[in-house]
A protein has these predicted regions:
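Short glycine/proline- and aromatic-enriched beta-strand/turn motifs that initiate or cap beta-hairpins
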Residues: 14-68, 230, 236-238
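Residues that define the transmembrane beta-barrel architecture of outer-membrane proteins
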Residues: 29-31, 66-70, 123-129, 143, ...
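Glycine- and aromatic-enriched membrane insertion/assembly motifs of diderm outer-membrane
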Residues: 49-111
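Predominantly the C-terminal beta-signal and adjacent terminal strand-loop region
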Residues: 185-238
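Outer-membrane beta-barrel strand-turn architecture
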Residues: 27, 78-82, 135-141, 182-185, ...
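Transmembrane beta-strands of outer-membrane beta-barrel pores
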Residues: 39-43, 92-96, 135-137, 151-157, ...
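Repeated loop/turn-to-beta-strand initiation elements of outer-membrane beta-barrel proteins
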Residues: 43-45, 83-86, 141-143, 186-189
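Transmembrane beta-strands of outer-membrane beta-barrel proteins
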Residues: 31-37, 86-90, 127-129, 145-151, ...
Length: 238
């Protein structure tokens, strides 16, 4: 919804000035550079297995809500053809995910809150390397919509090593997105919405550090698979 409102407002502004074609030759450059700032919503998809502890407890993990993070990238754009560009945009993404653990087998008489539910805050600082193919429509006055598809490597440099669930630092993601080039008098503004889907199971099941701590180990034992997902709203300045 936010992306649609921002895009409509910027497009309307550009069309108000469409009698003058801004930056007419910018798309003919073989290579150009830029940068972006934006926000991201990080998520993880958790596959629970219904593991039961020795005392009969069954814990389930979930991410019930999401909070926005911040991201910044630099951009190198290579023109392949009239409507095709290859874009490389390394950067950093900051965000966090709150995992809730619920003991579904806790009887009503259990009053200790830690026996009923717990939470874990996973803060992430991703170094990202994103490579996308940009497929653009023909320019209409001062706007030009486009779609993107590509891959993104991520490496988390802010891992807490004592958490209930430990996730691998590295991951690879498939990305699809949409956006619009808006040609302004002094630069090209490109709001873009991108969806990122993790390709690997990032859960680290081998936890020798928790062999003597079954109270913590039960959370890892209750989960089979964890994959990263992310929604990113960025504004490119080119």
């Amino acid at each position: 919804m936010l992306f649609a409102l921002v895009l409509c407002a910027l497009t309307a502004f550009a069309q108000d000035n469409d009698k003058i074609l801004n930056r007419q030759y910018v798309d003919q450059k073989k290579i150009h550079f830029g940068f972006s700032v934006g926000t991201n919503f990080q998520d993880i998809h958790i596959v629970n297995n219904g593991f039961q502890t020795e005392d009969g407890e069954t814990w389930f993990a979930d991410v019930p809500q999401h909070s926005p993070g911040f991201c910044v990238n630099v951009l190198a754009d290579l023109r392949l053809a009239k409507n095709f560009n290859l874009r490389f945009s390394p950067g950093m993404y900051f965000g966090n995910k709150v995992v809730k653990y619920i003991n579904s087998s806790a009887p009503d008489e259990v009053t200790d809150p830690l026996r009923r539910n717990q939470s874990q805050n996973i803060k992430s600082t991703y170094i990202v390397l994103s490579l996308d193919l940009k497929i653009s429509a023909n320019r209409y006055h001062n706007v030009r919509p486009y779609f993107t598809g590509g891959v993104m490597g991520v490496f988390d440099v802010a891992k807490d090593r004592t958490e209930q669930l430990r996730l691998a630092n590295g991951d690879a993601m498939l990305t699809v997105g949409m956006g619009c080039d808006i040609y302004l008098p002094f630069f090209k503004l490109c709001p873009e919405l991108k969806f990122c889907f993790g390709l690997k199971n990032v859960l680290q099941k081998n936890r020798p550090d928790l062999e003597d701590n079954p109270e913590m180990m039960r959370f890892t034992q209750s989960v089979d698979k964890v994959t990263n997902n992310m929604v990113v709203l960025t504004f490119y300045f080119e």
